């Protein structure tokens, strides 16, 4: 045993001595020019290494360098620069003075994908033909990334497309490994901070680049992300998921399949693809088993009452995003001009502004700024909602047009969702045509226009009982009638119809008609959506709810009573002209009785005098 251990120690000493001698005999700086030339020959980039190269033996034989940079031909700034670079090399090739790099590690790297880092073609450089009819060579089908392992730590990626704003990804950690067939795996994490928003993302998956650049596929097995900051819910948005991606060079197409993502309590699945032509062509086919927009897009609008107090609807306290000065003068929706799209969305459950929709289906197309929504429908509270329309952003001034169709939708839910303090419930059906310049609740209150026909059933308006108001007014003015007791401060109608017109925040109600077992009304009026005021004029016949029988009751059943309702929605006033009707009724009754008496005494002098008096009245 002692001899065996002695022999083993001798071999170990010889091995260590040999390796040490090899490292001492091979100068890593001898490979500097070789690496620079190889990088330039294979990629066209200029590699610059600052400071001397040195060996690092444990735990992996490596070459260490100081600052390094990688610059494209003619670029004004380097594409990659790093504080340190480590090359893990194989030992045996060094015996023949060859360099075999197994892994490259960059620390403190800054990667810039900006116009300043792009290659610039010299004026005398030859121009390749647009269509290359030469057959592909086997060498053309490999991956230019010929390193088995790449590791990037504590680095930064700066991305900028043309004149757009820069996007900076910080705290990057990237680990990539591949086999000789260019199939590999990767892990990535980073953080993006922009416009007072912070996005943290991490993902891992596999990639197949055996046919790159003609075809590249990747499977994102796990992605985790969290978004926090301005214009977001207080708790932020976080989720996870997986998907598959494929790039097809011949079609310039990027496809996403088997998408499965979550965002807070919302879920998404489906597929998407984009063809990168001069104007990108998008195609989306997405399904949402659950989509809670209230938990993704908070509302900050308020509705002000007469006393100035703000009423918060479904809004949450959020930090507003800063206004970017370069975007102030941009026409609204101009981003639609830069691409085309064919979109099909389906959602089993959608929550928006506190309203719960089911079976939502959307089909729309964008043709370089002309957005056509051919289908946008769903179910709400047992009713049907359809909202097809168009958004024309091809000019400086956008034009939006919608043709809403509602069938048996609870109106109280809609009023509450948009913060209208109107105590009104009932099933509403509506068919209309509205237009404006901005899709926004506040813009609708001020600047939209259109018209619609409205029908409502089982209507209930809290705060006023028209029947009770008229009957009590008749009793107070000495009418010899008795009303049935009704202590509800509610007006109920079995059916109500009207034609409305909207212009700059003012809704004009024409040809209002309503019926119930005790009421029949007609009228017209206006609602000011911005000021939350109204002024309506009704003619009401109380056809039921009276006790007993009398000529006055018969008169009131047949005679419309003028009723004006006006003022702030939360403090309504009314004006009721019952005394004039009663006075007219007494006058007519007196005339009738005098006329009857005069007829019975027409031959007498008194009868003739009364007859003459009635003719003058």
UniProtKB/Swiss-Prot annotation:
Keyword hit for NADP: no
Cytoplasmic side: 1-3
One GO process term, biological-process aspect: regulation of protein targeting to membrane
Intervals, Periplasmic compartment: 25-617
GO CC entries: periplasmic space; plasma membrane
NCBIfam families: PRK10833.1
Name recorded for this polypeptide: Protein AsmA
Species whose genome carries this gene: Escherichia coli (strain K12)
Lineage: Bacteria, Pseudomonadati, Pseudomonadota, Gammaproteobacteria, Enterobacterales
